[in-house]
A protein has these predicted regions:
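Gly/Ser/Thr-rich active-site loops/lids in small-molecule metabolic enzymes
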Residues: 55-74, 146-154
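Self-splicing inteins and homing endonuclease
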Residues: 36-37, 42-53, 115-120, 124-129
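Phosphate-binding and adjacent anionic-ligand microenvironments
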Residues: 74-198
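Short, charged, surface-exposed secondary-structure boundary motifs
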Residues: 7-13, 67-70, 111-116
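Short Gly/Thr/Asp-enriched flexible loops that form oxyanion-binding sites at enzyme active sites
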Residues: 45-64, 89-90
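N-terminal small/polar loop signature for handling phosphorylated ligands or for N-terminal nucleophile
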Residues: 1-49
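Buried hydrophobic positions in well-ordered alpha/beta secondary-structure cores of metabolic enzymes
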Residues: 22, 26, 38, 43, ...
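Short hydrophobic/aromatic-enriched beta-strand-loop microsegments
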Residues: 1-2, 56-61, 98-106
Length: 198
């Protein structure tokens, strides 16, 4: 859908975090009876997905799904995420997949650089990903590349189908989301860094 390039984006904002954009891909996925729907931002460094039933796979769930794909090849490894992930993701990564979860500061460069730092120190870290859908894989030289992540998902769909399953089986043990919200507080002091440390 919307395959004709138009830099004014007349259909919706090209953003996996935008509700209108997600509703559009949900409708397209369900109406076309697709196994998976994929959505990217304008420069394709962020992505999100929609299951065949229209369920959105974003935020914690997209990190969980990519981690589940990587877990067999990287047992006991460390997944680096931004600081706004939930306890349900930590539970899934650690208790279900047997991985480690390092919840780090926001900013995709911070998450990616921490992942590189850990790998250089001998701590296997195959994935750095933010809840925004911004992700980088060790397998892809830590480039923030939504298309590479999407290919991983498409391969997982094919493997699941070959085994009589659907891709959502990868995250069936991810606890349901109770409530989600992001709040931003205005900090009025000039020295905001030291304010944040207190």
């Amino acid at each position: 859908q919307f395959l004709d390039p138009d830099g004014s984006f007349p259909n919706h904002i090209p953003n996996p975090e935008n509700k209108e954009a997600m509703q559009s891909i949900r409708n397209a996925t369900v109406n076309n009876k697709a196994d998976l729907g994929l959505i990217f931002d304008t420069d394709v460094d962020r992505m999100s997905a929609v299951l065949a039933n229209g369920e959105e796979v974003n935020r914690d769930a997209i990190i969980a799904m990519i981690s589940a794909i990587l877990a067999p090849d990287y047992p006991n490894s460390t997944i680096i995420t931004d600081s706004v992930t939930s306890d349900r993701l930590t539970y899934f990564l650690e208790d279900v997949l047997g991985l480690k979860h390092l919840c780090y500061m926001r900013g995709y460069k911070n998450v990616i650089n921490k992942c590189k730092e850990l790998n250089n120190a001998g701590v296997v870290s195959p994935l750095a990903m933010e809840t925004s859908g911004h992700g980088a894989l060790k397998d892809n030289y830590y480039l923030d590349d939504g298309a590479f992540l999407a290919v991983k998902l498409v391969i997982a769909v094919a493997k699941a189908k070959a085994n009589g399953k659907t891709i959502d089986s990868l995250i069936e043990k991810l606890p349901p989301l109770v409530e989600e919200g992001e709040y931003r507080f205005k900090i009025t002091t000039e020295d905001f860094k030291s304010y944040g440390k207190n």
